[in-house]
A protein has these predicted regions:
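Bacterial Sec-dependent N-terminal signal peptides
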Residues: 1-40
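Short beta-strand elements
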Residues: 823-838
Length: 839
């Protein structure tokens, strides 16, 4: 970080330069023409004229300033009242976030005030006793940053902790006032409102995106996005860093729960629904009740070779084009206003340095005219971590020329200085600067910020309303998954229930990361009005019938996986008074690098708790509350029922109580493959040749992939029968639309919803085909005895694959379509090979 005039960089951040904690505590906020492709969003001539007029009057300094995004923390200071540092807590925090021992010891030798100055802006507990954190905006600093450096975007919540609507109104209105005064261009303020207004107190939090994937209901995705947009605008925030469509195909990755699961079609359909909900029906004219989206993280961020956050991916060209690119392509075509870029590399190329992926694939091939923003300080990573640039200036040159339009450089204006040097030296052309700024201005005009820089106040009376709460509850009910039921559910009232496990009585586990704070920790005071699982079950079954003895609890002063010494004997003793045991197990909240793990197995303490309770002879219902599928193969056989609630949000406990009691019916299905063992982490669309198992000789071609439960699996209190699977044609060619119909009947005695999934299999291909691929899905509701006919319109080109030559190919031959257990065969009569990158 360059040392500038003191009114530019707060001294605490200059000192923090050498402290690697800043890096490990980083936040996710997260074009020319080619082909005869129409723009993803049809251009509005009047709006484009305004963009050109504004661009024509801007100086180089103003243009470069628009390309910089700063963290709000740099414009103020966090004061911690009654602060006395607990050095053991400081040591624990530094160790948790990976600070080197040498840096840790150096910090511990500093005075209390020096430690507070360096760490007070972060949502970590390093204090003795009770404290109160107060953040104040420095108007002089804000003046300088906007008047001198022309900063065009600001992000984040102070200390990454949710603020009130009134605070957001005060801060953003002042920012907009300064922006319009000094440069005549409004700021575009961004927040990680990922599953509701996560950084705004009193708003509506929804289940995490992985739950939306489990619901298989795109209408829920759109509704949740509409509500989040409304409540974001109530807080005066016009831009959200969402949706997330990183395919979660490695269960070790700490951000599995932030996407819609492992399948590209689920992610693609959900992202389109969310973009429509967030932005409304006209992305050229987004009204005051909708927001701009930043679809992220473009792309393959969720495929780290090591399973660790922000580490390299190594993928075949076919896998990239067919699967990892697909949701982002659909997001671009749906008009997402912006995209955020993957922090890591793919096949040795950092995404922030890839002209092919950033400019050619997105801006040229798709004619997408939004802007690309980096993730947290990721241009710096090109020289500090990826080693493809010699210094920061070189990294800026590489990234901007590759296609990056806005740099999230949280604590420094050095970007502006170095980029100006690059332009003056001819290393970055003025045409590239103009292209980037034009895209940023386009987003601001589309959001209506020039005409109405601020929103909120009158017209936003539904903020945090019961109406919105009901939508969140419905999403939770439709996304919690019944994985096993040996006749114990619905659970009759009047029984004594032992409620145990570390997730039984904590809101943090239910709302997950990006909830009030970055890690979702130390925010219990902001979620007190919602019900934990314990409180929800007390409301449903009567407090006198619920015995709470957790046996294992989380250590809130440690890492997300830290647990106190177990007290399993107490839980076993309490089981004597119970008729049934509900064990709430899983994970505490986390996100990003702090959520890395070294062992996919559920913690030994929790598994030992279940094993000990099994010996009591009382039936056990396992409730899994987790952001990724932790291995439970040794305890699943001990359970009479298993429910996976994933991360269901503030109404997840209420939803679970309704479902366990039979007042609502399960309809969720797994959005990922649940593995049984660490050496079998296949996804559902594995190659047939990947099937492995116990060898019955030299080879066993009848072996299957080892898994706990398959993708798309989920039970209900009723049963559904599929019949009459038909297609309107048995032979087809590439330009055909295949109409697929199937009858679905509710054959049980309870009303229920069913996600209907359409799969295809290519029986023989010139490269090894996937064993099956999801092609479409929908969700229906059926009364007992009711039958509905479901219709899918399947474009034949969707059955194509990327061949060895990199071209889309549909080969003649046999295909099988499957819905439920029903199959139908169809035949492609002619091979077609496309010369275009997208079909």
């Amino acid at each position: 970080m360059l040392s500038l005039h003191p009114d530019i960089i707060i001294q605490q951040f200059v000192t923090m330069k050498k402290n690697l904690l800043m890096a490990v505590l980083g936040l996710i906020s997260i074009g020319a023409q080619a082909q005869d492709t129409k723009p993803a969003i049809p251009r509005d001539a009047a709006l484009e004229a305004k963009i050109e007029k504004t661009l024509s009057r801007m100086t180089l300094d103003e243009k470069i300033g628009q390309m910089l995004e700063l963290n709000l923390d740099v414009m103020g200071k966090m004061t911690v009242e009654n602060a006395k540092v607990d050095r053991e807590k400081v040591r624990s925090v530094l160790q948790q976030y990976g600070a080197p021992p040498k840096e840790t010891e150096a910090l511990l030798k500093m005075t209390d005030q020096q430690i507070i100055d360096r760490l007070s802006n972060y949502p970590v507990d390093i204090y003795q006793g009770e404290t109160r954190r107060v953040w104040q905006l420095n108007e002089t600093m804000l003046d300088t940053l906007i008047s001198k450096w022309k900063v065009g975007s600001i992000l984040n919540a102070p200390g990454t902790r949710a603020a009130t609507v009134d605070q957001w109104q005060q801060w953003i209105r002042l920012i907009q006032k300064k922006s319009m005064k000094y440069i005549g261009i409004p700021d575009i303020y961004g927040l990680d409102h990922n599953h509701g207004v996560t950084y705004t107190q009193g708003g509506t939090l929804f289940p995490q995106p992985i739950n939306l994937g489990a619901s298989f209901n795109t209408e829920l995705a759109r509704t949740g996005a509409e509500i989040t947009a409304y409540e974001s605008r109530a807080a005066n925030c016009p831009w959200v860093y969402n949706p997330v469509v990183d395919l979660s195909r490695d269960p070790r990755w700490p951000r599995v729960w932030e996407s819609f699961g492992e399948d590209p079609i689920v992610n693609a359909k959900m992202v389109v629904a969310e973009i429509q909900g967030y932005q409304g029906d006209d992305p050229n004219h987004i009204d005051r009740f909708h927001v701009g989206t930043s679809t992220k993280h473009y792309f393959a961020y969720g495929a780290p070779w090591t399973g660790k956050d922000r580490t390299p991916a190594y993928l075949s060209p076919q896998m990239i084009r067919e699967k990892y690119f697909e949701p982002f392509k659909q997001a671009a075509l749906a008009g997402t206003l912006t995209m955020m870029v993957n922090s890591a590399s793919v096949n040795g190329v950092p995404l922030h340095a890839s002209y092919e992926y950033l400019t050619k694939w997105l801006k040229e091939d798709l004619q997408w005219d939004g802007f690309l923003v980096t993730d947290w300080a990721d241009i710096n990573n090109l020289f500090t971590r990826e080693k493809v640039a010699k210094d920061k200036k070189d990294a800026i040159r590489i990234a901007i020329n590759a296609g990056i339009d806005m740099s999230m450089d949280p604590y420094s204006v050095e970007f502006c200085i170095l980029l100006k040097e690059l332009v003056n030296e001819g290393q970055v052309k003025m045409e590239r600067i103009d292209d980037a700024v034009r895209r940023i201005l386009r987003a601001k005009y589309r959001l209506g910020l020039f005409d109405e820089p601020n929103t909120g106040g009158k017209g936003y009376e539904k903020f945090g309303s019961d109406e919105f709460a009901k939508a969140s509850l419905q999403t939770a009910e439709e996304s919690e998954i019944l994985l096993k039921n040996e006749g114990i559910l619905p659970l009759a009232k009047g029984q004594k229930i032992l409620l145990t496990g570390p997730n039984a009585n904590q809101m943090r586990c239910l709302h997950g990361g990006w909830s009030y704070t970055w890690q979702g920790s130390r925010a219990e005071d902001l979620s007190e009005k919602y019900n934990t699982i314990y409180e929800a079950l007390c409301n449903k079954y009567g407090e006198e019938n619920i015995i709470l003895e957790q046996g294992v609890t989380y250590n809130e002063d440690g890492a997300y996986y830290a647990e106190h010494a177990p007290e399993i004997d107490k839980a076993v003793a309490a089981a004597d008074k119970a008729d049934v045991i509900i064990a709430c197990i899983g994970e505490n909240s986390y996100t990003e690098t702090p959520g890395n793990l070294t062992d996919l197995w559920l913690s030994e303490n929790q598994r030992n708790l279940v094993k000990a309770l099994y010996k009591t002879g009382k039936p056990i219902i396992l409730v899994l509350n987790e952001g990724r599928p932790r291995l439970i193969a040794d305890i699943e056989p001990l359970a009479t029922a298993v429910v996976d609630i994933l991360i269901p949000g503030n109404y997840g406990g209420d939803a679970l109580a309704n479902l366990l009691a039979g007042d609502a019916n399960f309809s969720g299905k797994l959005p990922y493959t649940y593995p049984r063992e660490i050496n079998s982490l296949n996804t559902y669309d594995y190659k047939v040749s990947e099937e492995v198992g116990t060898m019955a000789g030299a080879y066993n071609y009848d072996a299957k992939v080892s898994l706990q439960w398959p993708f798309g699996y989920g039970l209900s209190y009723t049963t559904f029968e599929y019949s009459n699977l038909k297609t309107d044609k048995t032979h087809f060619t590439a330009d055909d639309i295949i109409t697929v119909t199937v009858d679905v009947k509710n054959t049980g005695k309870t009303a229920g919803k069913e996600a209907v999934l359409l799969y295809s299999s290519d029986l023989v291909a010139s490269i090894v085909p996937d064993n099956r691929r999801l092609r479409d899905f929908t969700k229906i509701e059926l009364q007992p005895g009711e039958t509905k006919t479901v219709t899918f319109l399947l474009p034949a080109k969707d059955l194509a694959f990327v061949g060895a030559d990199g071209r889309w190919t549909l080969e003649e031959g046999d295909f099988i379509l499957k819905v439920g257990k029903r199959t139908v065969s169809i035949v492609c009569d002619a091979t077609k090979v496309w010369d275009t990158p997208n079909i």
